C-alpha cells in the first residue's frame, strides 16, 4: 500500500507537533517588540519572507520558587535569536523536508510493519503463525495496542476494497489467547505479565529453558508501596500505569515546570542490568519491536496520541560535513578511521571546546560571530579530511556555535523524524517517572547513529554542567540553550500562536533537561523486555525443532542416541553447580568455576586476569567482558554485578565466554 503517491504534500521549514494557528512574524519590528519578533522568527519562520507585525508576547507568570529548568526562559529566546542570525548566512542550498499527510489507516499499517507484525495483514496473512507466537509473549496492554491498530488497518482495507485476504482480527487474537493459555512445558519461560502466574512454585533446579516466573519478577507486596524514586524495570511500564490508575482513582497531579527533578535509581538486579550495546543484533531487533509496542501501549493507557511521521526522500549532499545525513557522514569517517560510531567532526568540535576549559563563563550560551562561523564552515568543508585545517584559529565559543550548527543542519533531526513528535509529547505525560519511562523507550528506538551521537552530546553537556560554579551554566541553562538546536530543525516547523510557541519552549526545554539528567538510566534496556526476548527465542527454537523433527523423522533414533551421549559427556565434564567459562583469546582458555550465591561476573573476570602473564598481562578491567551466549538469548554482555548463579538458573543452557566488545 503506497499512500505517499496519493497524498498531498506539505512543505515544512521547521517542525511543530500540532500547532495550527498561523501567525506571521515581523522582521522589522522596532522598540519593545523587536526582541519578541526576532525570537518568534528564529524558531518558526527561518525561511519565510513578507511577515507582518503581531502583538507583544504576554508576560510569563512565574512562581517565586523556580527550579533550575525555569531559571530564565530568556536563555531559550536568546538562543533562537542567535540561530536566526546564523541561518541568515546559510540559507543557500537548503531544501525543505516534504511530509505527506497519511490516509486513514496508513499510520497504523506502518506501525505494524515497524513492530514486526506485517503478517497480521496483507498478502502474508495466510501464514500468521510467526506473528501469533510473537503475540503470545506480549503483555495485556501491549496486545491491546496491537489489536487496536490491526482493527484500524482491517477496517480501512475493507473500506478500500483492497484485494487482500482480510482476516477477522478476532480470529488472530483468539489464537494468540489460546497460545497463552496452553499449559507451559518445562522449557517455557513464563510471561512477565503482572496478572499472571501468581502463586506458582517450582523446585530450585533450573529447567531446560528458563526458571519459573517468580525469578522473572520481584514482586512488591501489595501493602508495601514501591519507592517513588525506584524505577521498576521488571514490570511493563504500561502495566504499571494501569495499576497506578486502579490503585488510585485520582491520578498524580500533572507536574509543573518548576517541580524539581527527583533522583531516580535502578534497584539492583541479580541477573544483571542490560544496557544498549550489550545484546546481539538479532536480539536488539526484537528489543526495538517490543519497545515500539510498549511505548504505544503506554501512550494509549495515558490517553496520549502516538503517531510516527515519515519524511519523503529529499536531495542531500553525499559528501562534506554540515547538512550531511549521519549515515553518509559515518561512512566517510569509517574510511578514515575504521569502527567510528560518532562523526569525527562532532568529536573534534567537542574536543576543541574542552581544550579551552569547561570553566569558561557562558559556554554554549555566548555565540560566535555569524560571519566568522560561516567562514569556518567553508574552511572546514575544504580542509577537515585533508588534515590541513588550523584548529588553533577556532575560538572556544566559535567551536560551540559550530557544534550546535552541526546539529541543526542535519537533514533530519538527531531525535529522528519518526519519533520527534513522541519526544515532544513526553512533556504531556502525567508524572516524572512516566516521562522517564517513555524517554527510555524512545532512546532504544533511535537509529544507532543517532543514538550514539546523542549519547556523546549528553555526556559532553553533563561535563559542562559539572563546572557550573565557574561557567554559570546550570542544567536548566544548558537545557534551554540546547533544546531549540535538537527540537527545531531548519527544515521543519510550522508557524504557531505565541501561547503555543511559549508552551513548546518550556516543554522542549523540560525534555532536554530530562535527557541530560537521566542519561545513565535512559540507555538501560528494561528487564521485562529482555525477558520477552528470551521468551520469543524459546518459542522460535521450539518451532525450529518441530520443523526439524519432520525433516529428520527417519533419523530420530540416531539423533536421540547422540543427544544422550552428549548429555552424558557434558554431565561428566561439568558437575552440577559448576559452569565452564571459555576465554579463547587469553592464555588460560577455559576454567571450571563453582557457582555460589555471592559469585559475580567481576569475580569470574578477576580469576582469569589474575592468571595472565606476558603480553596478556597488560589486559585491564573494562577491556574484556564476560558474555552469556546461547540458550534463550543470542548474546549478552554481562555487567560486573551479575550474580552468576541467578543468571544460570534463568538460562542454564548458555555458554560463558570472555572476550572484548565488538567495535
Curated annotation (Swiss-Prot):
Residues 27-37, 85-102, 178-205, 212-222 have a biased composition (Basic and acidic residues). It holds the Pfam family RhoGAP. The modification Phosphoserine is found at residues 65, 68, 260, 263, 610. Its main location: cytoplasm. One of its GO terms (molecular function) is GTPase activator activity. Coiled coil: none annotated. Keywords: Cytoplasm, GTPase activation, Phosphoprotein. Signal peptide: none annotated. The record marks 365 as: Arginine finger. InterPro entries: Rho_GTPase_activation_prot, RhoGAP_dom. SUPFAM superfamilies: GTPase activation domain, GAP (SSF48350). Residues 38-51 have a biased composition (Polar residues). GO terms for cellular component: cytoplasmic microtubule; cytosol; nuclear speck; plasma membrane; ruffle. The modification Phosphothreonine is found at residue 156. It comes from the Eukaryota. Residues 324-523 form the Rho-GAP domain. Residues 14-73, 85-106, 173-228, 245-277 are annotated as: Disordered. Disulfide bonds: none annotated. GO terms for biological process: regulation of actin filament polymerization; regulation of cell motility; regulation of cell shape; regulation of small GTPase mediated signal transduction; small GTPase-mediated signal transduction. It is found in: Cytoplasm. Widely expressed: expressed in most organs, except small intestine. Interacts with MPHOSPH6. Rho GTPase activating protein that suppresses F-actin polymerization by inhibiting Rho. Rho GTPase activating proteins act by converting Rho-type GTPases to an inactive GDP-bound state. Plays a key role in tissue tension and 3D tissue shape by regulating cortical actomyosin network formation. Acts downstream of YAP1 and inhibits actin polymerization, which in turn reduces nuclear localization of YAP1. Regulates cell shape, spreading, and migration. PANTHER family: RHO GTPASE ACTIVATING PROTEIN 18,19-RELATED, RHO GTPASE-ACTIVATING PROTEIN 18. This is Rho GTPase-activating protein 18. The lineage of its organism: Eukaryota, Metazoa, Chordata, Craniata, Vertebrata. The gene is Arhgap18.
Amino acid at each position: 500500500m503506497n499512500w505517499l503517491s496519493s497524498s498531498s504534500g506539505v512543505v515544512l521549514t521547521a517542525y511543530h507537533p500540532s500547532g495550527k494557528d498561523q501567525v506571521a512574524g515581523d522582521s522589522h519590528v522596532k522598540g519593545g517588540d523587536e526582541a519578541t519578533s526576532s525570537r518568534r522568527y528564529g524558531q518558526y519562520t527561518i525561511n519565510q519572507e513578507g511577515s507582518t507585525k503581531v502583538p507583544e508576547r504576554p508576560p510569563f507568570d512565574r512562581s517565586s520558587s523556580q527550579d533550575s529548568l525555569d531559571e530564565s526562559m530568556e536563555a531559550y529566546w536568546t538562543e533562537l535569536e542567535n540561530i536566526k542570525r546564523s541561518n541568515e548566512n546559510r540559507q543557500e542550498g537548503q531544501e525543505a523536508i516534504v511530509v505527506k499527510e497519511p490516509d486513514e489507516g496508513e499510520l497504523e499499517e506502518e506501525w505494524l510493519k515497524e513492530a514486526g507484525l506485517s503478517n497480521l495483514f496483507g498478502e502474508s496473512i495466510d501464514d500468521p503463525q510467526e506473528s501469533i507466537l510473537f503475540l503470545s509473549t506480549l503483555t495485556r496492554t501491549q496486545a491491546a495496542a496491537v489489536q487496536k491498530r490491526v482493527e484500524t488497518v482491517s477496517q480501512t482495507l475493507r473500506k478500500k476494497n483492497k484485494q487482500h485476504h482480510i482476516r477477522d482480527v478476532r480470529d488472530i487474537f483468539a489464537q494468540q489467547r489460546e497460545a497463552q493459555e496452553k499449559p507451559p512445558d518445562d522449557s517455557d519461560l513464563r510471561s512477565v505479565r503482572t496478572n499472571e502466574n501468581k502463586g506458582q512454585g517450582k523446585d530450585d533446579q533450573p529447567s531446560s529453558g528458563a526458571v519459573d516466573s517468580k525469578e522473572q519478577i520481584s514482586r512488591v507486596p501489595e501493602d508495601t508501596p514501591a519507592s517513588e524514586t525506584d524505577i521498576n524495570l521488571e514490570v511493563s511500564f504500561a502495566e504499571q500505569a494501569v495499576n497506578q490508575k486502579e490503585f488510585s482513582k485520582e491520578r498524580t497531579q500533572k507536574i509543573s515546570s518548576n517541580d524539581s527533578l527527583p533522583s531516580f535509581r535502578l534497584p539492583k538486579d541479580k541477573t544483571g542490568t542490560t544496557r544498549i550495546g550489550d545484546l546481539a543484533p538479532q536480539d536488539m531487533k526484537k528489543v526495538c519491536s517490543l519497545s515500539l509496542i510498549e511505548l504505544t501501549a503506554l501512550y494509549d493507557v495515558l490517553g496520549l496520541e502516538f503517531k510516527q511521521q515519515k519524511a519523503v526522500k529529499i536531495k542531500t549532499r553525499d559528501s562534506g560535513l554540515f547538512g550531511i545525513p549521519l549515515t553518509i557522514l559515518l561512512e566517510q569517517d569509517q574510511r578514515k578511521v575504521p569502527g567510528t560510531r560518532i562523526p569525527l567532526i562532532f568529536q573534534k568540535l567537542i574536543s576543541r571546546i574542552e581544550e579551552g576549559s569547561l570553566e569558561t563563563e557562558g559556554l554554549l550560551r555566548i555565540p560566535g560571530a555569524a560571519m566568522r562561523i560561516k567562514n569556518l564552515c567553508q574552511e572546514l568543508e575544504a580542509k577537515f579530511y585533508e588534515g590541513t585545517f588550523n584548529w588553533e584559529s577556532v575560538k572556544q565559543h566559535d567551536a560551540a556555535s559550530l557544534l550546535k550548527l552541526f546539529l541543526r543542519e542535519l537533514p533530519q533531526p538527531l531525535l529522528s523524524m519518526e519519533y520527534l513528535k513522541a519526544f515532544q509529547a513526553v512533556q504531556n505525560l502525567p508524572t516524572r517517572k512516566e516521562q522517564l519511562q517513555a524517554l527510555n523507550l524512545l532512546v532504544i528506538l533511535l537509529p544507532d547513529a543517532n543514538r550514539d551521537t546523542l549519547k556523546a552530546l549528553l555526556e559532553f553537556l553533563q561535563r559542562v554542567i559539572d563546572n557550573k560554579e565557574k561557567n554559570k551554566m546550570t542544567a536548566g541553562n544548558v537545557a534551554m540553550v540546547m533544546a531549540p538546536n535538537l527540537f527545531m530543525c531548519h527544515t521543519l516547523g510550522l508557524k504557531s500562536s505565541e501561547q503555543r510557541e511559549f508552551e513548546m519552549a518550556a516543554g522542549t526545554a523540560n525534555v532536554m533537561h530530562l535527557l541530560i539528567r537521566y542519561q545513565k538510566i535512559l540507555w538501560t534496556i528494561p528487564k521485562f523486555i529482555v525477558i520477552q526476548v528470551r521468551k520469543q527465542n524459546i518459542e522460535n527454537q521450539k518451532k525450529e525443532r518441530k520443523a526439524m523433527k519432520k525433516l529428520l523423522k527417519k533419523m530420530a533414533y540416531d539423533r536421540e542416541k547422540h543427544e544422550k551421549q552428549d548429555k552424558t559427556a557434558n554431565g561428566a565434564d561439568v558437575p552440577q553447580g559448576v559452569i565452564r567459562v571459555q576465554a579463547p583469546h587469553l592464555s588460560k582458555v577455559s576454567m571450571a568455576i563453582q557457582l555460589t550465591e555471592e559469585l559475580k561476573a567481576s569475580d569470574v573476570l578477576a580469576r582469569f586476569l589474575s592468571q595472565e602473564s606476558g603480553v596478556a598481562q597488560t589486559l585491564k578491567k573494562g577491556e574484556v567482558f564476560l558474555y552469556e551466549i546461547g540458550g534463550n538469548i543470542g548474546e549478552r554482555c554481562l555487567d560486573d554485578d551479575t550474580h552468576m548463579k541467578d543468571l544460570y538458573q534463568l538460562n542454564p543452557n548458555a555458554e560463558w565466554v570472555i572476550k572484548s566488545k565488538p567495535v
